[in-house]
Amino acid sequence: MVMAKNLTKFYVVFLVVLMMVVSLLLAIEGRPVKDSSRSLTQMRDSSMFNGSVIMSSFKPVESSVKDLSWLATVKQSGPSPGVGHHRAKGYKMFGRANDSGPSPGVGH
């Protein structure tokens, strides 16, 4: 009976440690959020997060609208979404097989 209590305590401690390790790995796995060209760690060390925000460092609204470098954080990798070659080109053929038959295979 004493061994069963020790074994239960071992499993509880093991599960708690495992959950802590998994949560730590999940927390450090993600990529840092980028603000223009600076990463989140650089932003955290900046004067904005230390409480000493300098008003002259703010950009005017016009330059913020023209500066579209923040769009680089939206898509960093992976396949491109495609421009228009997957759109339905002929609505008359929609719902029918255009060229039926077996596909020629990869690269043909």
From Swiss-Prot:
- What does the PTM comment state? The mature small signaling peptide is generated by proteolytic processing of the longer precursor.
Presence of the UniProt keyword Glycoprotein in the record: yes
Residues with attached carbohydrate: 50, 98
Q: Which domain of life is it from?
A: Eukaryota
Q: How is this protein annotated for GO cellular component?
A: apoplast
Q: Does the keyword Ubl conjugation apply?
A: no
Q: Which GO terms describe its molecular function?
A: hormone activity
Q: Where is this region: Disordered?
A: 76-108
One GO-annotated biological process of the protein: regulation of root development
Signal peptide start-end: 1-27
Q: Which residues form the propeptide?
A: 28-92
What are the Hydroxyproline sites (modified residues) in this protein?
102, 104
Q: Identify the keywords attached in UniProt to this record, alphabetized.
A: Apoplast, Developmental protein, Glycoprotein, Hormone, Hydroxylation, Secreted, Signal
| Subunit organization | Interacts with CEP receptors (e.g. CEPR1 and CEPR2).
Task of the protein:
Extracellular signaling peptide that may regulate primary root growth rate and systemic nitrogen (N)-demand signaling.
Question: What does the sequence similarity comment in the record state about its family?
Answer: Belongs to the C-terminally encoded plant signaling peptide (CEP) family.
What protein is this chain from?
Precursor of CEP16
The species is: Arabidopsis thaliana
Gene behind the chain: CEP16
